[in-house]
């Protein structure tokens, strides 16, 4: 839960030093209780000097949505540096990691976790989005690919369209359809690492 909240609310937690989330707990087996801080968890990328499969890049562009609304989109991506991400937090927050020193949920080098996070309306709405955005099939070549798509309303609206529960971008919206079309172009496709 701590890692999930640290991923979903990473921008909120890092905007102002007074923004905090704590998880209070009580262990019913031994009566111990305590409080754990939620730490913002951002992706970090392998330097382009190291010739990663997907070089680090950042782009921004505008997309039109329903009823003529305009959105500013920022797309950051690259090859994730899992070692840098864990070593930065391991000493102060060892409970965030498995005994092998990896994150427990979002940032793991496997097929189900590859892809980008979608930021809109003040938080991460979707994580590990891959096949819905890119014209590719998940396979081990993309295990280290990651990034973030940030969507900001610019004209004609104050919010990004979401589903009824407000927990994900409305994938039936014109905004989403246009975003998928743009990110499926060769310019934005991730590069995979072949394991021979």
Regions of interest found by a model, annotated:
Residues 1-107:
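Glycine/threonine-rich ATP-lid/beta-loop region of ATP-binding domains
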């Amino acid at each position: 839960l701590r890692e999930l909240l640290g991923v979903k609310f990473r921008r909120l937690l890092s905007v102002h030093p007074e923004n905090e989330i704590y998880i209070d707990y009580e262990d019913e087996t031994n009566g111990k209780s305590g409080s754990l801080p939620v730490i913002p968890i951002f992706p970090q990328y392998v330097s382009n000097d190291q010739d990663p499969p997907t070089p680090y890049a950042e782009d921004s562009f505008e997309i039109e949505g329903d009823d003529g609304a305009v959105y500013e989109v920022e797309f950051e991506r690259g090859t994730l540096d899992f070692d840098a991400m864990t070593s930065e937090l391991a000493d102060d927050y060892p409970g965030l990691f498995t005994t092998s020193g990896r994150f427990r949920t979002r940032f793991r080098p496997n097929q189900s976790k590859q892809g980008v996070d979608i930021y809109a309306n003040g938080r991460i709405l979707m994580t590990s989005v891959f096949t819905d955005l890119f014209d590719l099939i998940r396979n081990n070549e993309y295990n280290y690919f990651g990034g973030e798509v940030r969507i900001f309303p610019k004209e004609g609206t104050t919010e990004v369209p979401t589903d009824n529960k407000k927990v994900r971008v409305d994938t039936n919206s014109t905004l989403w359809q246009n975003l998928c079309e743009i990110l499926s172009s060769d310019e934005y496709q991730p590069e995979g690492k072949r394991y021979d």
